[in-house]
């Protein structure tokens, strides 16, 4: 729980939907601070968190299942507006005395609702008789409304697609306004928070910056703090924010594992030492990391080897910093949400997480996580607010294990150098074409596959380079980017001509799912 007493805020009750985070992102985009908490922790949350409005998320359960999650009755006794989305509408109706039954037909995917009555929830969409495209995902449906509710909109499969008790300001919608497939869903959510709940939308990065600085000073006092710097956006923004708060009480430790992009280590050192004058310990551990990776070809073993060694090197260097009492990490809000998710339960490990979980317990450092309230796009906005170069905060995501997971097979110094050059050429051509900011992530992969080629009159037998570029909003799903062919042609020609060791270039047109964005 964060200190947000100076902000109007919304409580989002999570019933296990895969897209609950999108509700929070839409609200934050409209300047409304919100927090997500699991349905079974709500009563405890309400003892300290005083929401101005409540949103009940969707979820995979049926209200007819034994021990199905139910909305706490306390939520309807707060005298604040409540919006139930999909399962949230169903559990609200069930708790308030309505009726929910299994649907004879299910609604999944694109659908249309017909507005039959005006409501401030749907202001700006159209009056009675207007049809609005939405995204449905439900099997059960409400068949009888609780007392005080009226129908606002219907759909082919749901007679109560939108319902409202205007007196108590309780609303239910059977579709998902938070997803991009509901084109004007953000407007519906804004109507709820701004028009119905009367919120001003005062959540800005300028306000967050001022409050975060005050919190850091209060937490750290005159203590010393260590920040692990990876060169990525999250740790860099955290470091600059902390330095603004406490100055040279901060020391950054930059462990260079030799697996960064071309010239990236030098850029990080220059920016933090010369531009921001932040005390920085630069550890060139490339030889140590590459030595540990010799002979390793399994992707998960690579990740674990890099993670283990990173902790060892960081531990070794941090121990040299006298009087350190705090450790700063760039934890983001999605990490916090997942740790207390209503979904819970075991899940398959697709890939171990990029980030290191912290230092060994014996170091007794207290954790400082100044970004734990923020989503990735908010971190970028905060970086701009703090004066970080836009080209830096706008960089594409880069994995913690670095180029090691973009080199299938054994990672050697020679293969790293080849990939660094190919990747730099690829990104250079993307920037020249003005496409960099239209792409979520772009990178080159060096494959452990050799092919025959011809250079001049000579035969070559070199490795293949795969180029990858995807569009996405959150990294959970992704589509391959449809380049103009001349951009790919220029990149491929330059790579083959300028990078010794590559004689063939291919483009990856796999979406996620079924593939992942990274190759390993």
Swiss-Prot record:
Gene (UniProt): guaA
Residues annotated as transmembrane: none
Subunit structure and binding partners: Homodimer.
Record function comment: Catalyzes the synthesis of GMP from XMP.
List of residues binding ATP: 230-236
Pathway entry: Purine metabolism; GMP biosynthesis; GMP from XMP (L-Gln route): step 1/1
Domain GMPS ATP-PPase: 203-395
Stretches assigned to the Glutamine amidotransferase type-1 domain: 9-202
Active site (UniProt): 86, 176, 178
GO molecular function, one term: ATP binding
Keywords: ATP-binding, Glutamine amidotransferase, GMP biosynthesis, Ligase, Nucleotide-binding, Purine biosynthesis
Domain of life per record: Bacteria
Catalysed reactions, semicolon-separated: XMP + L-glutamine + ATP + H2O = GMP + L-glutamate + AMP + diphosphate + 2 H(+)
Keyword Ligase in annotation: yes
InterPro entries linked to this entry: Class_I_gatase-like, GATASE, GMP_synth_C, GMP_synth_GATase, GMP_synthase, GMPS_ATP_PPase_dom, NAD/GMP_synthase, Rossmann-like_a/b/a_fold
One GO cellular component, as annotated: cytosol
Organism lineage string: Bacteria, Pseudomonadati, Pseudomonadota, Alphaproteobacteria, Caulobacterales
UniProt cross-references to PANTHER family, sorted A to Z: GMP SYNTHASE [GLUTAMINE-HYDROLYZING], GMP SYNTHASE-RELATED
Name this polypeptide is given: GMP synthase [glutamine-hydrolyzing]
EC number(s) stated in the UniProt entry for this protein: 6.3.5.2
């Amino acid at each position: 729980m964060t200190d947000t007493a100076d902000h109007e805020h919304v409580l989002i009750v999570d019933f296990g939907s895969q897209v609950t985070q999108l509700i929070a992102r839409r609200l934050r985009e409209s300047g409304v601070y919100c927090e997500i908490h699991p349905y079974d922790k709500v009563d405890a949350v309400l003892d300290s968190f005083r929401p101005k409005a409540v949103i009940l998320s969707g979820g995979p359960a049926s209200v007819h299942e034994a021990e199905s999650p139910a909305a706490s009755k306390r939520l309807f006794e707060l005298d604040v507006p409540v919006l139930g989305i999909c399962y949230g509408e169903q559990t609200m109706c069930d708790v308030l005395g309505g009726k929910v039954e299994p649907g004879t037909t299910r609604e999944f995917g694109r659908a249309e609702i017909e507005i039959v009555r005006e409501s401030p929830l749907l202001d700006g969409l159209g009056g009675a008789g207007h049809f609005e495209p939405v995204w449905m995902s439900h099997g059960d449906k409400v068949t009888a409304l609780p007392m005080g509710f009226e129908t606002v909109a219907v759909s082919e499969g749901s007679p109560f697609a939108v319902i409202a008790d205007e007196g108590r300001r309780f609303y239910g919608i059977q579709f998902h306004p938070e997803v991009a497939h509901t084109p004007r869903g953000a407007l519906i959510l804004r109507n709820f928070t701004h028009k119905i709940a009367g919120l001003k939308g005062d959540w800005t990065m300028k306000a967050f910056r001022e409050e975060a600085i005050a919190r850091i000073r209060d937490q750290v006092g005159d203590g010393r703090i260590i920040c692990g710097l990876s060169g990525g956006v999250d740790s860099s923004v955290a470091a600059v924010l902390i330095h603004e708060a406490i100055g040279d009480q901060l020391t950054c430790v930059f462990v260079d594992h030799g697996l960064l992009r071309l010239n990236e280590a030098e850029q990080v050192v220059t920016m933090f030492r010369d531009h921001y004058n932040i005390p920085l310990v630069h550890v060139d551990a490339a030889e140590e990391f590459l030595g540990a990776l010799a002979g390793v070809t399994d992707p998960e073993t690579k990740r674990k080897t890099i993670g283990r060694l990173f902790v060892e090197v960081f531990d070794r260097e941090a121990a040299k910093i006298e009087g350190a009492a705090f450790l700063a990490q760039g934890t983001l809000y999605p990490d916090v949400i997942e740790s207390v998710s209503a979904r819970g339960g075991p899940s398959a490990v697709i890939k171990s997480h990029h980030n290191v979980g912290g230092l060994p317990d014996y170091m007794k450092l207290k954790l400082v996580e100044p970004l734990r309230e923020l989503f990735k796009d908010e971190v970028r906005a905060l970086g701009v607010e703090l004066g970080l170069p836009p080209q830096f905060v706008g960089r594409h995501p880069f994995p913690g294990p670095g180029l090691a997971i973009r080199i299938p097979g054994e990672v050697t110094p020679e293969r790293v150098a080849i990939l660094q050059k190919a990747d730099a050429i690829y990104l250079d051509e993307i920037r020249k074409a003005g496409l960099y900011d239209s792409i979520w992530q772009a990178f080159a992969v060096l494959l452990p596959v050799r092919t025959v080629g011809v250079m001049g009159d000579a035969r070559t037998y070199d490795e293949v380079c795969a180029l990858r570029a995807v569009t996405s909003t959150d990294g959970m799903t992704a589509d391959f980017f449809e380049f103009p062919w001349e951009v790919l042609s220029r990149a491929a020609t330059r790579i083959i001509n300028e990078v010794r060791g590559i004689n063939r270039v291919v483009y990856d047109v796999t979406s996620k799912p079924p593939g992942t964005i990274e190759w390993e």
